[in-house]
Design a protein with these regions (language model features):
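Catalytic alpha/beta active-site cores
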Residues: 1-230
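Glycine-rich ThDP/TPP pyrophosphate-binding loop and its adjacent helix/strand module
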Residues: 195, 235-238
């Protein structure tokens, strides 16, 4: 094992609790409390109106605001959410898909308000809108337009936020929706390959930066009760 691999193996995992309260203020208090107790990163849960692009006063958002996560609709709320949290030192996961570009834009703007250069930001946006058509359903735009959003965001991060993971390919949700372990990995890898092909074909990323784009993709993989099959799946997936 080379020195770089040894260093990566010994690097501690980021410890972060997936959470979001009914308001940005309440969520901020929770995050600062958890960080004070040893948590090393943030994992932000957004409410459904935020996930699907509705303002809190929209009729379709009635009864859903702040219910399963924090509502964030403008920069002021993002500033409140991250108040007194040094985002330049954080590794932040945002579980957000259809509106990922919007939320990342707010996160970057908040960082700039804190005097942090976007090139220093580390974290992940799920941004796997394709899987929303296969499982969860929080898509907003048609499939091709959704994929264009994914591609544009990956290209933007490659140039301006290079330490960020702009997409988290999700196989987890596919198994929850009924896929077998084999189908789960097959469909998610097909999704990842299609996205990377679209990024390459868009012409937005120079050839010399494309390997870094491939390396910036992360994966969210399920592990069900079929023990032997799941072990084989994980071994095959990592080859």
């Amino acid at each position: 094992m080379d020195e770089a691999s040894e260093s990566r193996r010994d690097h501690p995992w980021v410890m972060r609790t997936y959470s979001g309260h009914s308001t940005a203020q309440a969520s901020n208090e929770l995050y600062r409390s958890n960080l004070g107790k040893g948590q090393t990163g943030l994992s932000i849960a957004f409410d459904l109106p935020t996930q699907t692009g509705y303002d809190p006063d929209h009729s379709l958002a009635s009864g859903e605001v702040g219910k399963v996560g924090v509502p964030v609709y403008h920069l002021g709320q993002m500033n409140t959410l991250l108040n007194e949290i040094p985002v330049g030192q954080m590794n932040t996961s945002m579980t957000i898909n259809a509106t990922a570009a919007w939320l990342l834009g707010l996160y970057i703007a908040n960082a700039e308000d804190q005097g942090v250069d976007p090139t220093q930001l580390r974290g992940t946006t799920q941004n796997d809108i394709v899987k929303e058509y296969l499982s969860r359903g929080t898509h907003v735009f048609p499939p091709e337009a959704s994929k264009r959003l994914i591609v544009d965001m990956i290209a933007y991060c490659s140039e301006h936020v290079p330490l960020w993971n702009p997409i988290n390919i999700c196989s987890y949700h596919l198994q929850e929706a009924g896929a077998t372990p084999v189908q789960e990995i097959a469909y998610s890898l097909a999704n990842a390959i299609d996205v990377l092909d679209a990024v390459r074909d868009s012409g937005q990323v120079p050839e010399e930066r494309f390997p870094a784009v491939v390396g910036s993709i992360s994966f969210f993989v399920n592990s069900g009760i079929r023990f032997v099959e799941e072990v084989c799946k994980m071994r095959a997936f990592t080859q």
